[in-house]
Amino acid sequence: MSPYTLWAAVILLAGTILRLWYSTHLELVGDEAYYWLWSRHPDICYLDKGPVIAWFIWVGTALFGQTVFGIRFFAVLLACGTGIGIYLLARKLFSDKVAFWSVVLAAMTPLFAVGATLMTIDTVYIFFWTFAALTFWQAKDEEKLRWWILTGILIGFSMLSKYTGAIELLSFGAFGVWHPPSRRHFRRPTFYAMLLVAALFLVPVLIWNWRHGFPTSQFLVHRGALDERAHIRPLEVFSFLAQQAGVISPLLFFGLIIAFCWPRFARTAKIETGYLVSLFLPLFLLYLFLSFQKASQANWAAAAYVGGLILVAAKWTEALRTRPHLRWLVIAGVGVALLETGILHETSWLHLPGGLDPLDRARGSRDLAAQIDELQRKTGARFVIANKYMTAALLSFYLPDQPDTFMPVSSPPFNQIVLWPTYRTKHP
């Protein structure tokens, strides 16, 4: 075992232990409580996304009870798995040294470091995205179907976690077009076997939507602001890019831009670099394009940074070999990222206003539930109706005995709660 492998393992193991400890120090955020509700209503699909995250939460809560730790347990393990996948991919493409620094970047990047504790969709689908990227790199040199089928399975689980997992197929196709030796797979059953296997995972999605009137398509159109009149809003594009710089860390994002826009800055293996570009650009450009209408949320392009961070590690490792005077810039970038990540794990000492505190959404739900419970005792109200799905989910988790909570029925439905039995049905 090389020293780089050993130290990467130490970082991943220590990070996992710390995150398991830290996971109970924050209240649930709205998304986590919402997906926890899914796990209490098993189904083959849900309005927003596929069922994979609900499966993980169901197993976690079966092991550790209906608790914050039970919900977040697999988030921490999946994040560790993603780190392992990043190391294996970077080592296969470049070297142990680049792989080590790729793990370091992922561990200290705010988007990955903070997200590794929360049981969100991104934590799940990035795990499958990372290993699909690893198996496809092996598959491209194979004529046998086993690696192609495995890649299709991983893409399938990625899509059942978040539908944008399908964009990785576009990444693979783009690489195949760019890389002449890989073009042969377009004339053989290998590439299409991968597509077929991945497509089979969408069968439960289609069945569920057929039973419910295809609400997912309406939800996705609304979510992407595609139901609004088309506009070009430069400020929204700027907002998207600023958000990306914030969640990656400004200097690391600057380093990523240099790695992509200045190929001669540091020479790295052409084919391997092209593969990382193909992993990054399709997903990133999709959300950049959508931001001309409305800026996406900061985390939506997260999977693109699996390839992006490895490319940064490869380019800047080589750059330091030929330009040692840039070491100060690398140290500054690492320092800023570590500082930002550290602050994001505990912000109470900063006394930030609610709108500026990134952890504000992970506080207050327990107190709100206590006040609601007291109000129910005084008034005799039998159930709770919330105006937002995250509020309804959080109250369901934190109220005594974790009762069902409800929302006003909307048409078309834009969250899963309104598709379940309503308060009129359960409390006539």
Locate predicted features.
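Transmembrane-helix signature of polytopic, membrane-embedded enzymes
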Residues: T5, I86-M108, F127
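Short helix- or helix-capping micro-motifs
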Residues: L12, S102-P110, V114, I155, ...
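Transmembrane-lumen/periplasm boundary regions of multi-pass, lipid-linked membrane glycan transferases
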Residues: L18, F157, L169-T273, L279-K294
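Hydrophobic/aromatic-rich transmembrane helices and adjacent perimembrane loops
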Residues: P42, F254, G274-Y275, F284, ...
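Membrane-interface transmembrane helices that cradle and orient dolichyl/undecaprenyl
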Residues: R91-K97, A132-W148
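Membrane-interface alpha helices of multi-pass inner-membrane proteins
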Residues: S102-V103, W147-Y163, A198-A199, F238, ...
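Short acidic/glycine- and proline-prone juxtamembrane loop motifs at membrane-interface regions
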Residues: L111, T117-Y125
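Membrane-proximal, lumen/periplasm-facing interface regions of secretory-pathway glyco-
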Residues: A298, R323-G380, Y389-W420
